[in-house]
UniProtKB/Swiss-Prot annotation:
<keyword id="KW-0677">Repeat</keyword>
<dbReference type="Pfam" id="PF01391">
    <property type="entry name" value="Collagen"/>
</dbReference>
<feature type="region of interest" description="Triple-helical region">
    <location>
        <begin position="92"/>
        <end position="124"/>
    </location>
</feature>
<feature type="compositionally biased region" description="Low complexity">
    <location>
        <begin position="135"/>
        <end position="145"/>
    </location>
</feature>
<feature type="compositionally biased region" description="Low complexity">
    <location>
        <begin position="108"/>
        <end position="124"/>
    </location>
</feature>
<feature type="region of interest" description="Triple-helical region">
    <location>
        <begin position="137"/>
        <end position="199"/>
    </location>
</feature>
<feature type="compositionally biased region" description="Low complexity">
    <location>
        <begin position="242"/>
        <end position="262"/>
    </location>
</feature>
<dbReference type="GO" id="GO:0042302">
    <property type="term" value="F:structural constituent of cuticle"/>
</dbReference>
<comment type="subunit">
    <text>Collagen polypeptide chains are complexed within the cuticle by disulfide bonds and other types of covalent cross-links.</text>
</comment>
<dbReference type="InterPro" id="IPR008160">
    <property type="entry name" value="Collagen"/>
</dbReference>
<dbReference type="GO" id="GO:0005581">
    <property type="term" value="C:collagen trimer"/>
</dbReference>
<keyword id="KW-0193">Cuticle</keyword>
<protein>
    <recommendedName>
        <fullName>Putative cuticle collagen 80</fullName>
    </recommendedName>
</protein>
<dbReference type="InterPro" id="IPR002486">
    <property type="entry name" value="Col_cuticle_N"/>
</dbReference>
<comment type="similarity">
    <text>Belongs to the cuticular collagen family.</text>
</comment>
<keyword id="KW-1015">Disulfide bond</keyword>
<feature type="region of interest" description="Triple-helical region">
    <location>
        <begin position="202"/>
        <end position="264"/>
    </location>
</feature>
Length: 317
């Protein structure tokens, strides 16, 4: 069961992973297509923007001419012929420079130039001039220490020593390596015969450990008929048994006798009692007895249940 469950879960996991890979591939393809489309739209937008700019620049001169004509006409129409106008007035000071215009487009490339004439070797002019002698400058800072030079040659041998004498013996050297084993020696002469031995008898040793238990023996023969043995002593009392089921309710008791009539009141005589009064009294007494009996039965049931629960706990313990 566990192997089948694991196989099913492994198959479902593989399907989910395969679906995730396919989704990633689709998302990657969609992103690439979106990027390509965005680049194409940007290129088209740049082309439209360049065309619009070129058309605006080409029509700039005509727009300026039309604008100047319109402004002059507007100025002429805005003149007022209210009085004589001044004439031959001196020119006013030049106005402030206007705002710089937009940068114009690059011009068309000019035609290729004509090839130049071939070069001619000219005469060489050599003028010998003396070197300019400058005064000596201040000494520069000390340089870094140089690399060590090569080792010098060996010196001449010294003069021989005189009167040294032989020195004390040196300490013992380390032990040498073990030598190879020597050849076997010649066999020796036979030894003398030994003395005669004495026979002795030792004491018995201690007893050994008991051996393992042997196999069970064969069943014995049936015994001869004999009288039963005497009765053993009585055993200890056993535990209390479980409480029995509650018994059935008993039969309702017989109705009681009628009570004696009460004494009359002191202030007025009571009328004689009728049979309806006695019947009502009997019904009330019977009801009271039934209610009391039900209460007793309910108490007995509660006590019996408690005993059953206590017995179960005792058995479990």
């Amino acid at each position: 069961m566990s192997t089948t469950f694991l196989s099913v879960m492994a198959g479902l996991s593989g399907i989910v992973v395969f679906g995730a890979l396919i989704s990633v591939f689709h998302i990657y393809t969609d992103i690439n297509s979106f990027v390509d489309e965005a680049h194409r739209e940007l290129g088209a937008f740049r082309g439209v923007a360049n065309d619009a700019w070129n058309s605006m620049v080409n029509h700039d001169d005509s727009a300026r001419v039309a604008r100047s004509v319109f402004v002059r006409r507007q100025k002429k129409q805005s003149q007022c012929n209210c009085g004589p106008q001044a004439s031959n007035c001196p020119a006013g000071p030049p106005g402030p420079p206007g705002a710089s215009g937009d940068r114009g487009l690059d011009g068309q490339p000019g035609p290729a130039g004509k090839p130049g004439q071939p070069g001619v070797a000219g005469p060489a002019h050599h003028q010998q001039q003396e070197c300019i002698k400058c005064p000596q400058g201040a000494p520069g800072p000390a340089g870094a220490p140089g690399n060590p030079g090569p080792q010098g040659p060996n010196g001449n041998p010294g003069a021989p020593a005189h009167g040294g004498g032989q020195g004390p013996p040196g300490p013992p050297g380390p032990a040498g390596d073990a030598g190879s084993p020597g050849q076997a020696g010649a066999p020796g002469n036979p030894g003398r015969p030994g003395q005669s031995g004495q026979r002795s008898r030792g004491l018995p040793g201690p007893s050994g450990r008991p051996g393992p238990q042997g196999p069970p023996g064969a069943p014995g023969q049936p015994g001869s008929g004999s009288t039963p043995g005497p009765a053993g002593p009585p055993g200890p009392p056993g535990p209390n048994g479980q409480p029995g089921h509650p018994g059935q309710d008993g039969q309702p008791g017989a109705p009681g006798n009628d009570g004696a009539p009460g004494s009359d009141a002191a202030y007025c005589p009571c009328p004689a009692r009728s049979a309806a009064v006695f019947r009502h009294r009997n019904v009330a007494v019977n009801r009271h007895r039934a209610v009391a009996k039900k209460r007793v039965v309910a108490k007995k049931r509660v006590v019996a249940r408690k005993r059953v629960v206590a017995a179960r706990r005792h058995v479990q313990a």
